[in-house]
From Swiss-Prot:
Its main location: cytoplasm. GO terms for molecular function: ATP binding; protein serine kinase activity; protein serine/threonine kinase activity. The gene is ndrA. Residues 407-508 form the AGC-kinase C-terminal domain. InterPro entries: AGC-kinase_C, Kinase-like_dom_sf, Prot_kinase_dom, Protein_kinase_ATP_BS, Rho-assoc_Ser/Thr_Kinase, Ser/Thr_kinase_AS. Residues 56-108 form a coiled coil. ATP binds at I118, G119, R120, G121, A122, F123, G124, E125, V126, K141. It comes from Dictyostelium discoideum. Keywords: ATP-binding, Coiled coil, Cytoplasm, Kinase, Nucleotide-binding, Phosphoprotein, Serine/threonine-protein kinase, Transferase. This is Probable serine/threonine-protein kinase ndrA. It comes from the Eukaryota. Residues 1-37, 442-461 are annotated as: Disordered. It catalyses: L-seryl-[protein] + ATP = O-phospho-L-seryl-[protein] + ADP + H(+); L-threonyl-[protein] + ATP = O-phospho-L-threonyl-[protein] + ADP + H(+).
Amino acid sequence: MINDHESVIDVGSDDERENFEDEEDTTTVYSSDPLSRPTMDRSLAAKMYIEQYYINAQQSVKERGQRRKDLELKLENMKLSSKESNDLRKELDKKESDYMRIKRLKLKRSDFEVIRIIGRGAFGEVSLVRHRESNDLYAMKRLKKSEMLKKEQAAHVRAERDVLASANTNWVVKLYYSFQDDNYLYLIMEYLPGGDMMSLLIKYDIFTENQARFYIAETILAIESVHTLGYIHRDIKPDNLLLDSKGHVKLCDLGLCTGFHRLHSSEFYQMLVGDAMTIKMKLIEATPLTQTERIASWKKARRALAYSAVGTPDYTAPEVFLQIGYNKEVDWWSLGVILYEMVVGHPPFLSDNTTETCLKILNCKETLQIPTDMGLSKEVIDLIKRLVCEKDRYKSADEIKLHPFFKGVNWDNIRNQSAPFVPELKSPTDTSNFDIYEEIPNDIDDDDNNNNNNSNNNINLNDNINSNCTYTTPTKKSNIMGKGNIKDKDLAFIGFTFKGFDAVNKSPTNRRNVESIFNTNNSTTTSTTK
């Protein structure tokens, strides 16, 4: 399988890199102390830039060679004429040249027209956008740098960018570009018009077991693809299961950017655990609402809670709360909770507040109750119990696939089957499967205006060195080796910029081409770890 994503971080065009050459020094004179903060910051930024540059150069050569090797292996197994084979080789060569040009482009927010906001959370928003030059549609995730740092999210957003950049699978949302400006980080991803699984659950309330089987099977393959990359998702929930135009599942939010991490304090949860009797008493006392009232209240606030800074703990495994050491099994716990919600109509540990939910999860052996009056099959009940448990939980996708609940599932071809619910789309820009959000006045171009207003004082080198380093200078462009101060938030996001090889495959074609050859089996979970 070809490696569709090339983890090459844009280091700017040739003329931009000339900024590193010596220039006439017209900058403000600072302390000559070699250990001063500005000197240390510039040294660190230069070191990070140089290291990243050579890592990328080496990786670029390696991945380009791998794409050629993959093509030749595919051609060996296809009965093509010599002319057809040579045409495909020439097409790959052209794509490689196009990709080199794409990597030299400097992207900015004004390159994209915002059509509509389709999601908003504590740290930013997601919009359907159109690239002004190519007219291609994307989902643009915009995150505020200051909030990322204040809420200690820098590592999480970088993790999401790294996983998306390295993912070569149809089970994870594609990342085409990432870039930044003075105030924001941007992830330019494929637009999936089907909405998310949470919207389906809100709309239909309860799935049949056949419907649940299909979506859980696809979610297993999606989680497996992330595990194959060497990652644990840790935030599997209906909000993070997106649906494409045909209703098939793709994973998103791979960085815990809106997850429940702010409450992941071992001291906090150890305090909640206490002794077993204390917890039982708290659970007995903390029940002011009836179950019917509790479910109704939860459904009403479902979407707002998903986009809050705290998030929801409903799908989180107990070992994540306690931070006592956990592995891939935490994602299978979340899968079991989602299955329960699909066939019952609400999560298994639904409570009046997050503290009570956490207490129930930590005592899942006693608090997990599966309704006996809903006609659920013994297979689905057993699968839930094998996933939502502290001990003897399933450890791998292969184990789960063998469960009787999945009898008859065609794992190798499921993505080519019809989904239970296929989105009804009136146009490529249809956003009817997303909630409606109001535009924030004067927000669309604030980054570009800010850059223009500060152009005489702060020189933005974020696309030149994959950061957003600014340097004080009275009249002319500076460079990373010059005088000035580097902001703390700038150092945190050096290396964020990315341009993926998939960007050259955006324009569809009906004839046999390189992209179609490398995607002859869309149901596979093959992926390459960077």
